[in-house]
Amino acid sequence: MPSSTVAKPKLAEKYPTWDGWVDSGEWAKTSPTGTLTLPANASEIMILALDPDVSVTQLARVTSRDQVLAARMLRLANSAYCAPLQEITTISEAVVRLGTASVRNVVLATCMASRLQSGNTYGVHGRGLAAHGIGTAFLAQLVARVAIVNQEEAFLYGLVHDMGKLLVLQLSKDYVRGGGKAPTEDEVVALLDARHAEFGGRVLREWHLPPVIEEPVVYHHRPDECASHPIEASVCYLADRLSHRYGFGCDASPDLPILDDPIATRLGITEAWLQDLDGRAPELFKSVTDAFA
């Protein structure tokens, strides 16, 4: 007796083009991965780090279970960026030095850097996106200090401001796995440019990160349209601009105007501050990227 089961149409039969599939939103159900996820250990550490009552002992114990994460925390705690007076040799000391919010950020940066090493998924874009995210994160902290907004939140939205690009790259591979024709490089780049901020917001909602992190990501190219967190969106915007100025994970644009930008003026950026950063940025970038290598 023949089976009554009706075969599901191939992905490419239902959605002949990749961008049509992406526009449909069906990928959230039909994609093998659906959306970007955090490893279980990383999720546990982030939850702990968000707990105002968490102890150094708790964080150190959980963090020590991940050798890669522990090594990166120690490297960062001893880097020129943190400038410790003496060498930090234990995870407990690193947690104290960095602070619980920074530990959360290091966890996410480590996960991001590790994920982007996957050439099969992110191809030639991966390493550049990792370096750009980490560089922008530290620049966002520096800008936030001037703007007098939360620096640890600034690190986080600076780090993940292009997270939507990772999802777009992942979806290009998932469509092929489902039987579709591989999109061209031009098609991928066009969607990256047009929708990465929107897709980044979707990823952060899946991760249950608060609006103060999500909205600066969604509006980092148009901060004046951000109603709820306009200052944070402006910090993210300017940090991204500075990252492009210095070539952090991308081609450098040293002539990119900063002081003429009204957003920089509103944030309190001065010529003296920018000149100081111009001199320090390359060394700081090297120290933090070495920590996450």
Role assignments for model-derived ranges:
Residues 1-178, 183-259:
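Conserved alpha-helical "signature site"
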